[in-house]
Amino acid sequence: MIQSSIRDLNPGKIVCLARTFAKHAAELGNEVPTDPIFFLKAPSALIGPGDAIILPEQSALVQHEGEIAVRLSASLTRASEAQAYNAIGGWSVLNDVTARDLQRADAGRFTRAKNFDSFCPLHPEFIDIADWRQVAVRTVVNGVQRQYGALSTMVFTPGRLLAYVSHFMTLEAGDIVSLGTPHGVDKLSDGDLVGIELVNLEGHCLRRLENPVRVA
């Protein structure tokens, strides 16, 4: 298990994967990709448990995207899937907060919509997972479940995602890679309390990230 505070993590990169769950791709009107799609999220967007997600004045539609993230314990360059799994140092949860109206205005591009300060809540304590096929991500807002997705239902395996990215850029020890969100993304409003949970398939919570939502 990797234990740290958000201040101590200091990742060189935060890499996020898109459209890794087919139903999420469909709810946004997108096709399921034949190869993984990834983008970078700025480390300056990181916040920890209990920190507020700030709704910026530039957006009228900010949405949650609950995801499972991994932290690398070794570097990967042009890696195989087996090498990718061996480089995973731990598993946690991340909220890929997105200004959806800005993303649509930017023809689907990610940078402006996903990199406001506070748009990357992350639980800084990473745990060991014996079998990734036995875990899921769940998003709960004000006590109501909005998202649920088992990793076994993803379009690509975690190893495939990491290996693919490593053929375009070197992934280094300490980097964070977030594996994508299931369907059910929805609007966040001032006063909401959003929780992202890493759960096993029996529903037991292994890790929970909780953040209040506030206007700027």
Each predicted region: which residue ranges?
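Short, acidic Gly/Pro/Ser/Thr-rich loop/turn segments
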Residues: 22-24, 46-47, 76-79, 98-100, ...
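A residue-level signal for conserved active-site and pocket-lining positions in enzyme catalytic cores
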Residues: 18, 70, 96, 122, ...
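RNA pseudouridine synthases
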Residues: 65-95
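Glycine-rich, pocket-lining loop/helix-strand segments that form or immediately flank
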Residues: 37-42, 46, 93-115
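Catalytic-pocket segment enriched in acidic/His residues
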Residues: 2-8, 24, 30-32, 100-216
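Extended, compositionally biased flexible segments
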Residues: 1-74, 195, 209-212
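Short clusters of hydrophobic/aromatic residues that line enzyme substrate/ligand-binding pockets
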Residues: 46, 53-55, 62, 79, ...
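Short, glycine- and charge-enriched coil/turn segments that flank and shape catalytic ligand pockets
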Residues: 59, 79-85, 129-132
